[in-house]
């Protein structure tokens, strides 16, 4: 059975291993200081929130999400990061995390819950196409 809970101080090592796996999947990484800053922000739970998914007591998935204002409607929930350990994929971990974030969004009363993925991430998109609606938007990043 998959158990989902908020991140706790004792989760640091397992969280960081999964967070680094997530960054490696997207061929990016950050300094150790950035991991420390992110971990501290997740534990504070003010600007960003974190969840862990466990199978048989082992952390196998993480989700980071935040709430933000929108210009034309009520606040939104953005699923910023979602990662499942490769050996735990296909067992419902990502779905459990997505559902847990949805519950947090409902409890907060937000109007919209959304996330992004790479266009060629076929396994993730197969899941997302089953549980959510693709709206056809394309994202652009302007380097500052």
Segments (PLM) and residue ranges:
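Conserved active-site alpha-helix within GNAT-family acetyltransferase domains
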Residues: 95, 119-138
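Acetyl-CoA-dependent GNAT
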Residues: 6-74, 98-99, 135, 141-144
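Conserved acyl-donor/pantetheine-binding loop and adjacent beta-alpha core of acyl/acetyltransferases
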Residues: 73-76, 104
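Conserved GNAT acetyl-CoA-binding A-motif
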Residues: 106-117
